[in-house]
Design a protein with these regions (language model features):
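Residue-level signal for inorganic ion chemistry
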Residues: 7, 35, 92, 114, ...
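Conserved alpha/beta core of the MobA/IspD/sugar-nucleotide pyrophosphorylase nucleotidyltransferase superfamily
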Residues: 168-243
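Conserved N-terminal catalytic core of the sugar/cofactor nucleotidyltransferase
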Residues: 36-107, 189-191
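Short, flexible, basic/aromatic active-site loop/helix in glycosyltransferases
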Residues: 150-176
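N-terminal glycine-rich phosphate-binding loop and ensuing alpha1 helix
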Residues: 1-61
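Hydrophobic packing residues within well-ordered alpha-helices of enzyme cores
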Residues: 16, 63-67, 128, 148, ...
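Residues at the starts of beta-strands that form the adenosine-phosphate
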Residues: 49-50, 136-137, 210
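Conserved beta-loop-beta/alpha segment of the NTase-like Rossmann-fold superfamily
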Residues: 83-152, 171
Length: 243
């Protein structure tokens, strides 16, 4: 198994209410930056050979230094991100394509992960890598705890309520066979078409491609709002007590 990981860490974190210049991926949980926990999981995943990170230009030196000092030897490059998350991932994909042309080595799968999800586990990464190779695409998800409702034609009122048993909340890392993800991003760039995640690109440009569900627990949270920090600390402490 040869998987390459892309970690998207370019978000400006508006909902975190951070001061200018601050980055949510560099906020600390248990004494280490959020992104440190994230990278470590991929460093320890046996299926992952190489890691690419996309971040804001001003954060590149800090992440390069952190990866070097922590011994994260799988980190091949820290790349400047783009305006949107999709642009950041695409920048990494272009770097991967260049490496393929240079070395002649094509990875089996590419995994795309949010840098602000620090609690993904190495064994989960390996499972998603394996299922991505087997089925072509695999995306982790959790069952929603709350009822979800559509907004009605009048945006001040609810519309219908979808059946909750048929809904899942999608997470990352999202895994794809290498050529599939590269082609999806190439086509999206040609059409200037944007989606909120990589699975949506595959759904649009390769509708015949099934995407395997990898159902997991509720630990794989994304650090998005200030309230997520104490929750993240609690998750870390609970997991530390299990070790």
């Amino acid at each position: 198994m040869n998987a390459i990981a892309i970690i998207a860490a370019s978000g400006i974190g508006k909902r975190m209410q951070l001061k200018d210049g601050q980055c949510k991926q560099l906020l600390e949980i248990a004494g280490f930056p959020v992104i440190h926990h994230t990278i470590r999981a991929f460093q320890e995943a046996s299926s992952v050979s190489t890691i690419y990170i996309a971040t804001k230009e001003e954060n590149i030196p800090a992440l390069e230094s952190m990866a070097a000092s922590a011994g994260f030897g799988k980190v091949k490059a820290v790349i400047e991100g783009g305006k949107e998350r999709q642009d950041s991932v695409n920048n990494c994909i272009k770097a991967i394509e260049h490496a393929i042309r240079t070395t002649g080595n094509t990875p089996d799968t590419i995994l795309v992960h949010d840098g602000a999800r620090p609690f993904i586990q190495p064994e989960e990464i390996d499972d998603i890598s394996r299922l991505s190779l087997q089925f072509g695409a695999c995306v982790p998800a959790t069952r929603p705890k709350d009822t979800i409702k559509y907004i009605g034609s009048n945006p001040d009122f609810f519309g219908e309520t979808p059946e909750r048993s048929r809904l899942l909340q999608v997470q990352t890392p999202q895994g794809f066979q290498c050529g599939l993800l590269i082609q999806a991003h190439e086509q999206a760039e040609l059409e200037n078409w944007y989606a909120t995640d990589d699975a949506a690109l595959v759904e649009r440009f390769f509708p015949e491609q099934p995407i395997k569900i990898y159902e997991m627990g509720y630990h794989n949270i994304k650090i998005t709002t200030p309230e997520d920090i104490p929750v993240a600390e609690a998750i870390f402490n609970q997991r530390a007590s299990w070790s």
